[in-house]
Amino acid sequence: MMGEFIIYYRGKVVGGIYDGFASLLNHPKSLVRNRVIYILAANAQWDDENRFDAILNDYLAHVIDEKPITARQCIKALAQVGKAKTQYIPRIIDYLHSADLSKYKDSMRPLIEQDIAETEKALTLYEKANS
């Protein structure tokens, strides 16, 4: 059906309305955003219609989420998105390079920087493997 596809979580169908689910990326509670980020990344591999294209900008915005834990979850999940959608890798890497991390406390910034480095490394490997 147009505008729908199945959302799987831990091997079980948990939803079918992609647009409504993706709108939760902007939920006020960070726990909800964390789960949506994780589930969307896990389901990117089944996105044959490239519907992730429509949400990529909103998804990438969470690289600098107001909550550092959500930012870290997003950055780590981007490796899974890039593996499933290799056409996004250059854009993801560019976004990670340009991310302004100055708003995060000194205690969190190094962790986020490490996550970015690990994700970039994984994405670069996926890109080389698919060239």
Locations of regions flagged by a protein language model:
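Alpha-helical scaffold domains
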Residues: M1-S131
